[in-house]
């Protein structure tokens, strides 16, 4: 369980823009927190967008009486569309504490308004804080839930639908190999699954329900997560909790 409390001196436009990014992190977000939306794409403009995040830090450990410098993130990503209904993203981590990794590599199809079909290497749709990019994080490091319970990325297929024109609800379901990013040749009889419901009740309050089911060996593990966010008078409040069972 973790909680977040943020303050701002007034409800300026800049603050509201930041809050909107924090609340609206979901399956349709690209590297800079904006959305790839079919209705906003220009039919004749296929020029890719380039994004990047660089995060360096210095740490001191009182227990060890030692310190270190680190490049925690040096991300580079390319997003764009090849058709009004087809978008793509490729993201590379050049330095994750000295390691290079391929992060996102997917194609997204938007056949009708509100519907998004994504195939490839993606972040699992579980936990709001898990879905945040480094430049949107509320702390210097990931929360306990993200670092200990959420298997961040995998290869699979997700389907998401945003019914905001009818009801303020978004739904995303995903199925994944369950082997992580670098072991994609194994034939699978059991997959990992995630489900996510986002309730955007009003501009002051929203919450989400999350479910993840994985089977790394012979035991299936199910995780249930709920997150809530509130914004009023320049204050951002956020809380998230998780419960785990074994079958």
Where are each of the predicted segments found?
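Detector for outer-membrane/organellar transmembrane beta-barrel domains
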Residues: 188, 198-247
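Inter-helical turn/loop segments and adjacent helix faces that build the functional surface
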Residues: 184-185
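A broadly tuned "polar low-complexity/structure-edge" signature
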Residues: 15-18, 22, 155, 231-233, ...
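Glycine/serine-rich loop-strand microenvironments at binding/catalytic pocket rims
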Residues: 9-14, 113-130, 225, 236-247
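N-terminal periplasmic/intermembrane-space "pro-region" immediately following the signal or transit peptide
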Residues: 4-55
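Outer membrane beta-barrel
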Residues: 39-180, 189-191, 198-206
């Amino acid at each position: 369980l973790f909680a977040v409390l943020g303050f701002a001196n007034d409800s300026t436009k800049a603050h509201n823009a930041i809050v909107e990014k924090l609340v609206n992190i979901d399956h349709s977000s690209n590297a800079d927190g904006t959305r790839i939306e079919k209705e906003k794409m220009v039919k004749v403009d296929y020029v890719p967008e380039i994004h990047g995040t660089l995060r360096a830090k210095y740490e001191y450990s009182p227990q060890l009486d030692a310190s270190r410098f680190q490049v925690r993130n040096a991300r580079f990503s390319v997003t764009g569309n090849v058709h009004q209904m087809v978008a793509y993203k490729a993201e590379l981590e050049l330095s994750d504490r000295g390691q290079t990794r391929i992060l996102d590599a997917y194609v997204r199809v938007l056949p009708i308004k509100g519907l998004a079909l994504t195939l490839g290497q993606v972040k699992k749709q579980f936990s709001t804080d898990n879905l945040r990019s480094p430049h949107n994080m509320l702390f210097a490091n990931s929360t306990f839930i993200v670092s200990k319970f959420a298997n961040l990325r995998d290869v699979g297929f997700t389907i998401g639908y945003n019914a905001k024109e009818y009801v303020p609800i978004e739904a995303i379901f995903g199925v994944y190999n369950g082997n992580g990013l670098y072991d994609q040749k194994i034939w699978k009889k059991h997959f990992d699954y995630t489900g996510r419901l986002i309730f955007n009740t009003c501009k002051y309050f929203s919450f989400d329900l999350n479910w993840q089911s994985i089977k790394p060996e012979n035991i299936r593990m199910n995780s249930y997560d709920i997150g809530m966010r509130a914004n009023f008078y320049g204050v951002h409040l956020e809380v998230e909790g998780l419960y785990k069972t074994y079958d």
